Amino acid sequence: MSDQQQPPVYKIALGIEYDGSKYYGWQRQNEVRSVQEKLEKALSQVANEPITVFCAGRTDAGVHGTGQVVHFETTALRKDAAWTLGVNANLPGDIAVRWVKAVPDDFHARFSATARRYRYIIYNHRLRPAVLSKGVTHFYEPLDAERMHRAAQCLLGENDFTSFRAVQCQSRTPWRNVMHINVTRHGPYVVVDIKANAFVHHMVRNIVGSLMEVGAHNQPESWIAELLAAKDRTLAAATAKAEGLYLVAVDYPDRYDLPKPPMGPLFLAD
């Protein structure tokens, strides 16, 4: 077949929401359930051809997403409703497409992204929750959210996050640029909201684990700055659990004009 006869290829971006509690992370792997595998299967059914997706951020086992962004290429010409309603009809109930947008050839869900934003939700109450048990992290000691917020501000800007980096992290550098980190209380919920150009492995969960020690008055406010300067993972607190973590937004250059739905998680005020 000559070049003139090749069918056109369309590049499509999707916004994806998922409850990660029953999945072994985003990335497709043999023998275990993954969000990527379920999404690719549903897309392939609608496109009537094999589809491979590329995501903005590969979340770990048990981690959720309300603002994940993916892209894929296909020769299938479909209406937007097919990529949203049609794909959702083929997805399990804990994964959903939130929006669809045709994108230019130079768009890449991962490499075009300029920042990622996560929210970590702590249910701070003496008694554990049931309904949201896989969507929040329970911490029974009273937490001082304002104290946590003050302690976290030393993490702003470009820093070496070795103290908050998983030992098995494969990133070439521990340096990341944190644009904001806010800790707020919403009734029994304490929310840690952090945005950075990118994250080293377990960075948010390791930061939150140490912030909870500060919030519970087990460590001074200055401890976070001391940990950052020490560049030693063994000095920081244990990694916070996966179930409280959400990828809530990914930033892209304005020229792509991607939709920006409410970030969520949707049981909280935006």
Swiss-Prot record:
The record marks 58, 78, 110, 126, 139 as: Interaction with tRNA. Residues 168-172 are annotated as: Interaction with tRNA. InterPro entries: PsdUridine_synth_cat_dom_sf, PsdUridine_synth_TruA, PsdUridine_synth_TruA_a/b_dom, PsdUridine_synth_TruA_C, TruA/RsuA/RluB/E/F_N. GO terms for molecular function: RNA binding; tRNA pseudouridine(38-40) synthase activity. The active site is at residue 60. Residues 107-111 are annotated as: RNA binding. It holds the Pfam family PseudoU_synth_1. It comes from the Bacteria. It catalyses: uridine(38/39/40) in tRNA = pseudouridine(38/39/40) in tRNA. Keywords: Isomerase, tRNA processing. It is an enzyme of class 5 (isomerase). GO terms for biological process: tRNA pseudouridine synthesis. Substrate binds at residue 118. Its EC number is 5.4.99.12. Formation of pseudouridine at positions 38, 39 and 40 in the anticodon stem and loop of transfer RNAs. Homodimer. Belongs to the tRNA pseudouridine synthase TruA family. This is tRNA pseudouridine synthase A. It comes from Escherichia coli O9:H4 (strain HS). The gene is truA.
